[in-house]
Amino acid sequence: MDVNKLMAELERKHPGESEYLQAVREVLMTVEEAYNQHPEFEANRIAERIVEPDRSFTFKVVWVDDKGEVQVNTGYRVQFNNAIGPYKGGLRFHPSVNPSILKFLGFEQIFKNALTTLPMGGAKGGSDFNPKGKSDREVMRFCQAFMTELWRHIGPETDCLLYTSDAADEED
């Protein structure tokens, strides 16, 4: 594996996704020597297969706030490598959420899940929705709208959501 060549290709495909590209570079540089001792890895293009998401999608989340006003947020889900089982990963609701951050977190989730020895791939999802300052009813309506859209793309044999505290970090 030539890390620089692989990274150049990823940078071409994913311009401006600095968090994701940095995470991939760090992992590849860490495993490069061991990887190159196994020609079968290169023959099967394992590195290329693991660094690219299997699927990534964006969807609109429409919900109504307490004033009766329609709000529109963006929802995301990134799914990485389901070779050993369904995708598994959490949700993050924060204004800073973007495709690069979710690709970075989904890529890392592959390895976290592998370390548990459970047959699960990696995933991460979320939205640019900010729960801070929202009423419990607004958070509930947003979550209902989010899941109404997300459910079309996931299921028990495809993608299992994981609870994380990211969605509940209202108080700082």
Q: Residue ranges of each PLM-predicted region?
A:
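Generic start-of-chain signal for non-secretory N-termini
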Residues: 1-18
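Ordered core of a single globular domain
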Residues: 15-28
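Flexible, glycine/charged-enriched surface loops at secondary-structure junctions
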Residues: 20-21, 37-44, 117, 154-162
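N-terminal cap/recognition module
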Residues: 69-110
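Structured beta-strand/loop patches that form or line metal/cofactor-binding pockets in enzymes
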Residues: 40-67
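Hydrophobic alpha-helical hairpins/lids featuring a short glycine-rich hinge
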Residues: 116-161
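Single conserved hydrophobic/aromatic residue that forms the stacking wall/gate
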Residues: 163-172
